[in-house]
C-alpha cells in the first residue's frame, strides 16, 4: 500500500501519533454518532477532532449510522435518515473533506433485497443532487450478505460520486455469504475506499491485521491488482502494532 492512500481511523487510541510517524491520513469517526452533528459534547473516550486535524493533512469523514437506513419503510425514519446524511455531507464539505463513508443500511430478515436496492437508489439520486462534483460518498457493507446488493445500487444510480467502501472485516463475519476476496472482486469496478481489520470469521472484532483468519497480505495484493487507486483505512483500536507488521511484511511503501 502506498502511504498517500492509507488512513487510520480515529477509533485508534494512538492514531494521531501513528499518523504523524508514518505520514498517513485520518478517518474521522467522531461523527458516527449522529448527536455530534447537532453539537453534542464528545464522549470521554473520543479523540478530540481538533487533535486529529493537527496530526495529518488528509481526511475521510465517517458519517452516522445508528438506526439509519435509506430503505426505511416508516416515512419518519426515512426523513431522519436523509436529514442525517445531509448533515454529514455538509459537515464534510465545510471541513474541506472530499470523501465520506456511510453505511449502506441493509437489515437481513427485514428488507427484501429488491426493495433495499430500489429504495436506496431513489434516496441517493435525490441526495446526490446537492453534492459537489468533487465529493465521493462511499457506501459501506455491514450486514449485507453479498456484494451484489451494493453493486446493484451503483448500477441503478450510475453516478461517479457514489461508490463503495468495502469493509473486508465485515465481509468475513457470519453476516456474509461469501469470502472477502469474492467481495473484493465483485466490488472492484465501483471501489473507492476499503476498511481493513481482522477477525476469526464469525464476529466483527476489529482485531489487529495479523490477529485473525484473514489473509491480509493476499487481500492487499488483490486490491492493488484490481483497484490500485482505492484508499484504505485501518479501523483498529491500536494502530502501531499493525503498522509495524505491514512494514515488516513490506506491505506499506
Regions found by a protein language model. Give the residues of each.
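Histidine-acidic metal/acid-base catalytic patches
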Residues: 1-2, 17-19, 98, 147, ...
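Active-site beta-loop-alpha junctions enriched in small/polar residues
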Residues: 9-13, 29-33, 64-66, 105-107, ...
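A short acidic, helix-capping loop that chelates divalent metal ions and anchors anionic groups
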Residues: 35-36, 67-73, 107-112, 173-175, ...
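Hydrophobic faces of well-ordered beta-strands that scaffold small-molecule active sites
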Residues: 3-9, 24-28, 59-63, 100-102, ...
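Active-site acidic/histidine proton-transfer and metal-coordination neighborhood
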Residues: 71-163
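Charged helix-capping and loop-helix junction motifs
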Residues: 41-46, 77-86, 114-124, 176-186, ...
